[in-house]
Amino acid sequence: MQIFVKTLTGKTITLEVEGSDNIENVKAKIQDKEGIPPDQQRLIFAGKQLEDGRTLSDYNIQKESTLHLVLRLRGGMQIFVKTLTGKTITLEVEGSDNIENVKAKIQDKEGIPPDQQRLIFAGKQLEDGRTLSDYNIQKESTLHLVLRLRGGMQIFVKTLTGKTITLEVEGSDNIENVKAKIQDKEGIPPDQQRLIFAGKQLEDGRTLSDYNIQKESTLHLVLRLRGGL
């Protein structure tokens, strides 16, 4: 059968294969056509990296399927950066790159100034002067990119179902405003919302600053039942 292999440059290679071919065989065929050594090839299908010992059939790769070929850099590595819109950016980096370098690469690709970027990995915000290796960020790690709003900040609201909502707020916003934003996102009327921070229930007339709620703070949302106290 024929399958297609698409490279990052946009070139598409056609290969003749059998379902029983293993991924190593496929990489050898790509080497024959393109001269790329198998140890520098990574093949992706349906978002999964394909392992050498498995066959095309194992991954349900059928005729006319398209695989994506990503090059494994010698000494370098690829990492992924996921934005809040769900878009994933691929970056070529070295473990010795510092976070500032990474933000510069994101600016090159996406046009977002570094001072508006916040990068999160394993729940931690990454500091400019530190390196990827300092944070144990390895090949194929995924960082999360959050935009820093001028003058505003982001906070998180966690519901009892475990869902986390992100809100854009100002420290001067009062709790009523925050509940209105939650209503806009989730459709929950403010009179059914109870917001908790640091174990305290937040009162409508007070502001986020009154409770020392800062950027990236997490509030907990509890629903007030109709007819309840």
Swiss-Prot record:
Keywords: Cytoplasm, Isopeptide bond, Nucleus, Repeat, Ubl conjugation. Residues 229 form a propeptide. PROSITE patterns: UBIQUITIN_1, UBIQUITIN_2. There is a cross-link at residue 48 (Glycyl lysine isopeptide (Lys-Gly) (interchain with G-Cter in ubiquitin)). Its main location: cytoplasm. It comes from the Eukaryota. It is found in: Cytoplasm; Nucleus. GO terms for molecular function: protein tag activity; ubiquitin protein ligase binding. GO terms for cellular component: cytoplasm; nucleus. It holds the Pfam family ubiquitin. InterPro entries: Ubiquitin-like_dom, Ubiquitin-like_domsf, Ubiquitin_CS, Ubiquitin_dom, Ubiquitin_ubiquitin-like. Residues 1-76, 77-152, 153-228 form the Ubiquitin-like domain. Ubiquitin is synthesized as a polyubiquitin precursor with exact head to tail repeats. Some ubiquitin genes contain a single copy of ubiquitin fused to a ribosomal protein. In D.discoideum there are 9 genes: ubqA: 5 copies of Ub and a final Asn; ubqB: 1 copy of Ub and ribosomal protein eL40; ubqC: 1 copy of Ub and ribosomal protein eS31; ubqD: 3 copies of Ub and a final Leu; ubqF: 7 copies of Ub and a final Asn; ubqG: 5 copies of Ub and a final Leu; ubqH: 5 copies of Ub and a final Asn; ubqI: 4 copies of Ub and a final Asn; ubqJ: 4 copies of Ub and a final Asn. Belongs to the ubiquitin family. This is Polyubiquitin-D.
